[in-house]
Amino acid sequence: DITDKEIELVSDALRSGWITTGPKTKEFEKKLAEYIGNEKAVCLNSATAAMEMTLRVLGIGEGDEVIVPAYTYTATCSVICHVGAKPIIADVAKGRHEMDYDNLDRLVTEKTKAIMPVDLAGIICDYDKILKLAERNKDKFRPGNDIQKGFGRLIIVADSAHGFGAL
């Protein structure tokens, strides 16, 4: 339930004159960094914006491929298209909503830069299997810049918008 306290806090934020970033955002970023055990956190207006920013920082773009699950939200594929890369759709496992981990290897090519698993509806992907896939396909990985070279394998860009805080 939304209480009067929450309504008051939102009203205070709106009256402060800070429409986007500001003291409340900085306070939230600090608390979020502590919660996830990191030194810093950056908050954007959506997971869509965060995923696109991540792909751009990684230098993923024209001519690159990113593997995504067939069962996901449209933003998973649209951010890949926005940066000029090509989404490669991985089928889901029979009877589940997750990617079929056993059939991902055949999707990896020398153009594949990343895999973007989706923690849909709070169901966390099997990141151990995904990491093993990335390690197994190191020989196909062709880094396009120093950041990608630093990974030395397929980059895992987790879309955890639905899985944030899930264990």
List the predicted regions and their residue ranges.
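Conserved PLP-binding active-site segment in aminotransferase class I/II-type PLP enzymes
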Residues: 1-57, 61, 130
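PLP-dependent aminotransferase-like
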Residues: 56-160, 165
